[in-house]
Amino acid sequence: DQIVAIGFEDKSDFDYCDATFYLKIANPGSIDTETPELPSVDPPSTVNNTTTGILAFEDLWPSRGDYDMNDVMLEYKSTLYQNALTGKAYRIVDEFTPLHNGGSLTSGFGYQLYKLGQDGVRSIQVDGPAGWKIEADQSSPTIILFDNVRSVIGQKYTVTIELNDVDPKLVASPYNPFIFVGNRDKEVHMVNYPPTAKADKELFNTHDDVSNVSAGIYYISRYKGEVELMPFGMNLPIIDSKLLADGEGVKIYETFPNFIGWVQSGGTKNKDWYKKK
């Protein structure tokens, strides 16, 4: 007898075992065992755009703590594939490499395509160290790469996401990256990027956090009670990460004097503050 197993996926964790059954074939050879040639999933014409950068986070939020902003640092490279005829995005390939862990706390990392619904994704594949997961119970695609940055320093993750031909503006990198510290519900995001559904919202406006949740302003603090929008997470160009990592335990605006001017201007001035003039 021949046995043919069939599995179905009912949501978005892509394990294809939500409903399974098998066929028992009484007449061997009645089913063609040759795999048919699959058509290409790529559109006839493709353009792609690659962005790179470094993500840096302070793990003591909602307190500023030492505010050295180097507790979790990752380098990323994201490539967006678009149909040249329609302009729609059909695939993104993200590479993340943890560079540095300057904190004493246990921090994990994930990211969310927060402008996109689950129906905008056809599949997600992650290649890298074990322990990654896809949070299928979120309203937007959310990928957790690791729970403890210390164990994966220098190891690369490659995430390939096949999309259902979506507006590229909905999947602009670096999306909504975040760390979570100690527990999954203590998330730290970049300025004005929203928490996921798993975050503990009661932490806002405690200690040094001055978020205005009703206005959609998240994860900020103040400098001397005056300069607002002091971040707990940053997206930087590719720089010598050693400059930031070496400032362990020292406030970032003491290591980089032009940092405050950059924050105060809303990012329009002192754009090269990280060059430490």
Residue ranges and their predicted role:
Residues 1-277:
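Extracellular distal adhesion/interaction modules in secreted or cell-surface proteins
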